[in-house]
């Protein structure tokens, strides 16, 4: 079991911790968050408005966070370079503050004794890995990696299956995306991106996303062939990708369904899901897949031009992939 520290006990930090407790390959030994004290950590970990109460025990004892009887060391450092990960036995660090996303900034964790850092966000310069798509390209000379974004983790497995079978000439992605913590509850100031500052609960907000372009980094053959945007909508969790693409080889919609289903039951099992049910977003809350293809929602204009729909729990599915990536990396030590 690889010993892991978590930096930033926000949505992803807490859910990575939850996911780790239902996985036997990753052992959370330390958590750092300068803004949340120990007793507050107990409360925030135990109660979750989106995913429900933690199914286990959590308490504070002797200055440690104790989850299911397992004591976890707590740090409250603002500067990553000052966190003594080594003293706590943490070999890997999940960088989930959303702040230290470059090689240089995330690299500060190595100073405190961590051996590797996994950034739980897209990174401008760290190599990005998406489980089921390019994780096998990881080699253990890499000390800092990124698990890309939740949307890239939804789009890339689907794009891979379609491209491998039919070839994608070009495509546009739209993600209809749930609210996240960076948004505002009511209208407020938002730096350069004025629309992002509008009230999250009362608007559909067009927003940028690098998720589609990032697919070109994890599937090099698709580089320059995909781009996309987002609509932020007033739901607390679960998002949906619409991939509209031109196919190289003509395909009936039933052919597409067939290959996606095969991938979901085979090589991409647990990562890509497949459903023919009449589902809506709530049906995917706390779903651990990166992406679930909605066979009944897609449409084809003709044999070369299709719109494909895939759901994802942007919090929990993604957090499970962070854990999977760490387990995979540990298997290569």
From Swiss-Prot:
Keywords: Acetylation, ADP-ribosylation, Apoptosis, Cytoplasm, Cytoskeleton, Glycolysis, Immunity, Innate immunity, Isopeptide bond, Methylation, NAD, Nucleus, Oxidoreductase, Phosphoprotein, S-nitrosylation, Transferase, Translation regulation, Ubl conjugation. The record marks 154 as: Not nitrosylated. Glyceraldehyde-3-phosphate dehydrogenase activity is inhibited by fumarate, via the formation of S-(2-succinyl)cysteine residues. The modification N6-acetyllysine is found at residues 59, 192, 217, 225, 252. Its main location: cytoplasm. It is found in: Cytoplasm, Cytosol; Cytoplasm, Cytoskeleton; Nucleus. GO terms for cellular component: cytoplasm; cytosol; GAIT complex; glutamatergic synapse; lipid droplet; microtubule cytoskeleton; nucleus; plasma membrane. Gene3D superfamilies: Dihydrodipicolinate Reductase, domain 2, NAD(P)-binding Rossmann-like Domain. S-nitrosylation of Cys-150 leads to interaction with SIAH1, followed by translocation to the nucleus. The effect of S-nitrosylation on enzymatic activity is unclear: according to some authors, it inhibits enzymatic activity and increases endogenous ADP-ribosylation, inhibiting the enzyme in a non-reversible manner. According to others, it does not affect glycolysis. ADP-ribosylation is likely to be a pathophysiological event associated with inhibition of gluconeogenesis. ISGylated. Its EC number is 1.2.1.12, 2.6.99.-. The modification S-(2-succinyl)cysteine is found at residues 150, 245. NAD(+) binds at residues 11-12, 33, 78, 120, 314. The active site is at 150 (nucleophile). Pathway: Carbohydrate degradation; glycolysis; pyruvate from D-glyceraldehyde 3-phosphate: step 1/5. PROSITE patterns: GAPDH. Changing residue 149 to A: Does not affect interaction with SIRT1. The modification ADP-ribosylcysteine is found at residue 150. Signal peptide: none annotated. D-glyceraldehyde 3-phosphate binds at residues 149-151, 180, 209-210, 232. Residues 1-146 are annotated as: Interaction with WARS1. The modification Phosphotyrosine is found at residue 40. PANTHER family: GLYCERALDEHYDE 3-PHOSPHATE DEHYDROGENASE, GLYCERALDEHYDE-3-PHOSPHATE DEHYDROGENASE. Has both glyceraldehyde-3-phosphate dehydrogenase and nitrosylase activities, thereby playing a role in glycolysis and nuclear functions, respectively. Glyceraldehyde-3-phosphate dehydrogenase is a key enzyme in glycolysis that catalyzes the first step of the pathway by converting D-glyceraldehyde 3-phosphate (G3P) into 3-phospho-D-glyceroyl phosphate. Modulates the organization and assembly of the cytoskeleton. Facilitates the CHP1-dependent microtubule and membrane associations through its ability to stimulate the binding of CHP1 to microtubules. The [IL]-x-C-x-x-[DE] motif is a proposed target motif for cysteine S-nitrosylation mediated by the iNOS-S100A8/A9 transnitrosylase complex. This is Glyceraldehyde-3-phosphate dehydrogenase. It comes from Rattus norvegicus (Rat). The lineage of its organism: Eukaryota, Metazoa, Chordata, Craniata, Vertebrata.
